[in-house]
Amino acid sequence: QATTMNVRIEEGWKQALASEWEAPYFEQLTGFVSERYRQATIYPPGNRIFAAFDACPFDKVKVVILGQDPYHGPGQANGLCFSVNPGIAMPPSLINIFKEIHDDTGSPMPADGDLSRWAAQGVLLLNATLTVEAHQAGSHQGKGWETFTDHAIEALSRNRENLVFILWGSYAKSKSSLIDHSRHLVLTSPHPSPLSAHRGFFGNHHFSLANDYLARNGKQPIVW
């Protein structure tokens, strides 16, 4: 019998999302996810499913970057969207993100794709779907994760002020309606994927725009 995963998650998030833990959809989701981890290769590692929340406590969030679902190749996904661990080759989208940061802010290209240094500064690196089957992009979409992460976005929108939400690509942009635009800055552009980066991701200046907004609202800018 499937029981709710004992969700270990940062305390501020645990409270902000209190109504999720006993919700029927979440029980169903955790039953599904637990079973898939037993039967197949699932990414990220089970102890990293909620890594984005743990790395960026609820009351420390300043910027939200929304991804779709985790990388599905061996050793890539680490629970933070777009991020890979040191020593893992940077995926093309991440290289394009660093190119835009370099062009926008002058920051040099980093040695690796580990974005935990952003998370430590208050950047929530949130995938809409938090798990995926090896080599099958999108395989855990529509199982309940999107409900959970939508509620996380809504909780931030409602309970925090002057955050920056960065939405790249049509999927992320579809989450714009969850956010109160009068309380927060919402930045949108095409996705950094090589398929779309030249259609307006490059030159979007999102990193400097985010920092300008944070500074205007008395918050420490992010060292991108």
Task: Name the predicted role of every residue range.
Residues 10-14:
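Short, contiguous pre-domain boundary segments
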Residues 7, 19-167, 171-174, 179-180, ...:
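A polyanion-binding, active-site-adjacent surface
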